[in-house]
Amino acid sequence: MNGQLNGFHEAFIEEGTFLFTSESVGEGHPDKICDQISDAVLDAHLQQDPDAKVACETVAKTGMILLAGEITSRAAIDYQKVVREAIKHIGYDDSSKGFDYKTCNVLVALEQQSPDIAQGVHLDRNEEDIGAGDQGLMFGYATDETEECMPLTIVLAHKLNAKLAELRRNGTLPWLRPDSKTQVTVQYMQDRGAVLPIRVHTIVISVQHDEEVCLDEMRDALKEKVIKAVVPAKYLDEDTIYHLQPSGRFVIGGPQGDAGLTGRKIIVDTYGGWGAHGGGAFSGKDYTKVDRSAAYAARWVAKSLVKGGLCRRVLVQVSYAIGVSHPLSISIFHYGTSQKSERELLEIVKKNFDLRPGVIVRDLDLKKPIYQRTAAYGHFGRDSFPWEVPKKLKY
């Protein structure tokens, strides 16, 4: 069933069920371009200097990339090359697509890390005892509704974008361009605090395309080659609503269509609106920035609790102060899905996890140049990362 332009539908929602929506964006979305460039810069430094202190923000607009931030590192980096390679990998390789890695202007405004921060966080300290790079609060979330312990809404939204990129790169759909957005609404049933996906209610896909392809051809291909290849058939029914290329035309995309900034897709990067978010972005930051490392650790804790059978759904909060190594607080919320109390789960977490940044970096191997891969399709729910390997808990 195709969605109406005014969005109205008469689908009835049964008692005890609810709708939840998550979105994702593709590699060529302007904000995601910036995330990937920031993490490409971080990786370039870590390859040469695993102890580099990096805070790199990126701005993208038509024909221009700006790097801004603070970096202290022994590495010698060719920023022009790093930026252009990242854009080339994304697929902006011709001006007809609105952006070209060969001709864009790359501006660099990078300085040293503030000595005030350095002396307060890591100078003259053992690695285990380094302080948090800033204050803040971070969350980790896990749910047993999927094998990945991630919400189905965000899993499907990411996979739709990944399928678009695959079909673009292998030439199956040559009219595709790198910029894309997806959104998935799932109907859930509540089950004693846990959530059970029943069906996919609505799917939205908007993807950049060339001038020649017609709208009907695009909509047909998106349904047959993208949605049906990604979304399990059991979740689709005759009442599922599709908004495919709802604007009708999306030729101008990427940084030409909208300016891009690092750190503007923090919900896409995490749990798609489930759980909670402390507000700190990930990309372009080394492990001393707890916005990133502690959020990864909190996810590790949450997934370990769910995979260990201690609860079906859980939210973990941690908080830090700049220069202080131990977290100020750790909180566990299990939504009533555990036979143990939240206090008992907290004791298990404290017994099994050391959440100081200098220990997180060792446990999760965060000095390795792995970050550019995290910067598209979500930082969580992908098996290749250490924080996705659940820890066997002792209690």
Curated annotation (Swiss-Prot):
Its EC number is 2.5.1.6. CDD domains: S-AdoMet_synt. It catalyses: L-methionine + ATP + H2O = S-adenosyl-L-methionine + phosphate + diphosphate. Mg(2+) binds at residue 31. K(+) binds at residue 57. Transmembrane segments: none annotated. The modification Phosphoserine is found at residues 114, 384. InterPro entries: ADOMET_SYNTHASE_CS, S-AdoMet_synt_C, S-AdoMet_synt_central, S-AdoMet_synt_N, S-AdoMet_synthetase, S-AdoMet_synthetase_sfam. One of its GO terms (cellular component) is methionine adenosyltransferase complex. The modification N6-acetyllysine is found at residue 81. Residues 113-125 are annotated as: Flexible loop. It holds the Pfam family S-AdoMet_synt_C. L-methionine binds at residues 70, 113, 258, 289. The keyword Transferase applies. GO terms for biological process: cellular response to leukemia inhibitory factor; cellular response to methionine; one-carbon metabolic process; positive regulation of TORC1 signaling; protein heterooligomerization; protein hexamerization; S-adenosylmethionine biosynthetic process. There is a cross-link at residues 228, 234 (Glycyl lysine isopeptide (Lys-Gly) (interchain with G-Cter in SUMO2)). Pathway: Amino-acid biosynthesis; S-adenosyl-L-methionine biosynthesis; S-adenosyl-L-methionine from L-methionine: step 1/1. GO terms for molecular function: ATP binding; identical protein binding; metal ion binding; methionine adenosyltransferase activity. Keywords: Acetylation, ATP-binding, Isopeptide bond, Magnesium, Metal-binding, Nucleotide-binding, One-carbon metabolism, Phosphoprotein, Potassium, Transferase, Ubl conjugation. Heterotrimer; composed of a catalytic MAT2A homodimer that binds one regulatory MAT2B chain. Heterohexamer; composed of a central, catalytic MAT2A homotetramer flanked on either side by a regulatory MAT2B chain. Belongs to the AdoMet synthase family. HAMAP family: S_AdoMet_synth1. NCBIfam families: metK. Catalyzes the formation of S-adenosylmethionine from methionine and ATP. The reaction comprises two steps that are both catalyzed by the same enzyme: formation of S-adenosylmethionine (AdoMet) and triphosphate, and subsequent hydrolysis of the triphosphate. Protein expression is regulated by post-transcriptional regulation: in presence of S-adenosyl-L-methionine, METTL16 binds and methylates the first hairpin of the 3'-UTR region of MAT2A mRNA, preventing recognition of their 3'-splice site by U2AF1/U2AF35, thereby inhibiting splicing and protein production of S-adenosylmethionine synthase. In S-adenosyl-L-methionine-limiting conditions, METTL16 binds the 3'-UTR region of MAT2A mRNA without methylating it due to the lack of a methyl donor, preventing N6-methylation and promoting expression of MAT2A. This is S-adenosylmethionine synthase isoform type-2. It comes from Mus musculus (Mouse).
